[in-house]
Amino acid sequence: MRVWIAGIVVCAVLPLAATAATKLLPAEIQSTFFDGAEFTAATPSGIRFKMTFSADGKVRRVPTGNGGARSEGSWKLDDNGYCTTWKGGKPNCFTVVAADKNKWSVMKGPAVIATWSK
């Protein structure tokens, strides 16, 4: 009976591991996004921005619709991902997780704060 229950638990857990999202390493974030090429960011509430992270450590966001604020700041890599500091703001650090083909989730702890797409 115990073997049977253990088998069910293993079968239930294995598919979850196979679909677990892949966290990007800081170097992968830099090579994928921080090359000066513009890409799209969308917040969970639907506000969209064109984002540009330059190789020199500068970042810019421009809203593409209603809502959101245009801003500039700086970025740097850290041990787990990257950090941004917007003008007049404090540093915030994030991780990036592959979500789908050409889509990535920007995470602040367990919360998705944006979806990036190319």
Predicted regions span which residues?
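Positively charged n-region of N-terminal signal peptides that target proteins for export
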Residues: 1-4
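Bacterial N-terminal signal peptides
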Residues: 6-15
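Lipid interaction determinants
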Residues: 16-72, 76-118
